[in-house]
């Protein structure tokens, strides 16, 4: 597949939250919510981001839609570096451009032929065309920054976990779904009404006229989540972050919502980042998977390959927790020790070290492992599995 088919590329994404308040002096304690996360999603693909509560899944999704600022790293959507638009303050966006591009382009040993991506080459050409003037480069890229952020929101949307809290109780269903069209000034009043009616029909709220002027409290949980899906899709985004959209719904209607989302992905030609703690749901909704633990991705690849041949001890533990319908089947319990450690200033060693049944003395002395490809489209971050540390 061509690199032009990349919908999303995340490079070394990090998000730190201060874990203490100081009137004077520098904050020294940070929660490492997301720490060095990298992955790609190509056109037509959906990636399931799985892990326990607190591992950084939702924080990653909120960064992508601009609800959180990244601490460091780069977010590329459809070949465009959108990271500068994710920062609230222009000065922070300018600092990012300086560190990511200007300092690199001005390095004594910089070689333009070393630029691997089309986007990086375009950035360098722009820098050259502006006379290698750093201020002009930053001003050019940050011009109309708020407008570009609005354009980004048109391409990237989010479906939130709680359909009872994510819908304004004072707005009608029509107003909720039409609000993105109003913000982006799309269509006439009649065209908006037609578009809302169409999207409500697409998500299974039929006939649309019976839902348009009702309020959220008049709908069931499943109907509310269908409204949330309609709101996310009304602008025809290319990429949608779905944050456990079925976890708060009754079991009897979860499958219907998942089937609906898969159908809409085909009809609207879009990709999902599907956040979940349920591996069975992940398998149904995605064709790629990334397993997170304490802010790090520890295993990633084709979902069938990873689930049929898990290599990381944590992935094996997650699979062991999935219920098996056969009452006669007996599955061994995973040899996982203790509980999840606090993510405040974690040591540089492997995040899973304290609980890992494979951990050796070498694992304690070397930094957290990088993702290493162990087979076709199957990556794991484990010193022992990758052969960088001798097994016990």
Regions found by a protein language model. Give the residues of each.
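Short catalytic/signature loops enriched in Gly
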Residues: 3-6, 19-25, 30, 87-89, ...
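P-loop NTP-binding/switch modules centered on Walker-like glycine-rich loops
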Residues: 66-69, 245, 249, 253-331
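Conserved ABC transporter NBD signature motif
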Residues: 73-84, 125-140, 152
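Conserved ABC ATPase "signature" region
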Residues: 191-210, 319
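Conserved ABC ATPase signature
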Residues: 214-219, 223
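A short, proline-enriched helix->beta-strand linker immediately N-terminal to the Walker B motif
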Residues: 234-238
């Amino acid at each position: 597949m061509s690199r032009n088919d990349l919908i999303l590329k995340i490079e070394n994404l990090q998000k730190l939250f201060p874990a203490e308040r100081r009137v004077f002096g520098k904050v020294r304690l940070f929660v490492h919510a997301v720490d060095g996360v990298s992955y790609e999603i190509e056109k037509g693909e959906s990636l399931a981001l799985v892990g326990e509560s607190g591992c950084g899944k939702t924080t990653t999704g909120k960064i992508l839609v601009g609800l959180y600022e990244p601490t460091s790293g780069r977010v590329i959507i459809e070949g465009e570096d959108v990271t500068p638009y994710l920062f609230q303050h222009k000065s922070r966006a300018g600092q990012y451009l300086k560190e990511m591009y200007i300092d690199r382009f001005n390095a004594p040993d910089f070689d333009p032929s070393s630029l691997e991506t089309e986007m990086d080459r375009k950035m360098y050409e722009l820098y050259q065309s502006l006379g290698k003037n750093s201020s002009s480069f930053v001003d050019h890229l940050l011009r109309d920054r708020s407008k570009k952020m609005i354009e980004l929101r048109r391409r990237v949307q989010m479906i939130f976990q709680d359909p009872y809290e994510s819908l304004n109780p004072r707005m009608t269903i029509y107003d909720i779904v039409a609000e993105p069209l109003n913000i982006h000034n799309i269509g006439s009043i009649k065209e908006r009404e037609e578009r809302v009616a169409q999207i409500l029909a697409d998500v299974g709220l039929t006939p649309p006229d019976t839902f348009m002027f009702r309020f959220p409290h008049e709908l069931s949980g499943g109907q509310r989540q269908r409204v949330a899906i309609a709101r996310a899709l009304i602008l025809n985004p290319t990429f949608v972050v779905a944050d456990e959209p079925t976890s708060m719904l009754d079991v009897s209607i979860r499958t219907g919502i998942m089937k609906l989302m898969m159908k809409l992905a085909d009809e609207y030609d879009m990709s999902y980042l599907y956040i979940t703690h349920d591996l069975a749901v992940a398998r149904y909704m995605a064709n790629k998977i990334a397993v997170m633990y304490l802010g790090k991705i520890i295993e990633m690849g084709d979902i069938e390959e990873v689930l049929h041949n898990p290599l990381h001890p944590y992935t094996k533990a997650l699979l062991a927790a999935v219920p098996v319908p056969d009452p006669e089947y007996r599955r061994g319990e995973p040899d996982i020790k203790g509980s999840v450690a606090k993510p405040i200033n974690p040591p540089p060693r492997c995040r899973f070290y304290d609980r890992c049944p494979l951990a050796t003395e070498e694992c304690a002395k070397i930094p957290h492992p990088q993702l290493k490809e162990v087979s076709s489209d199957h990556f794991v971050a484990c010193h022992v599995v990758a052969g960088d540390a001798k097994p016990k």
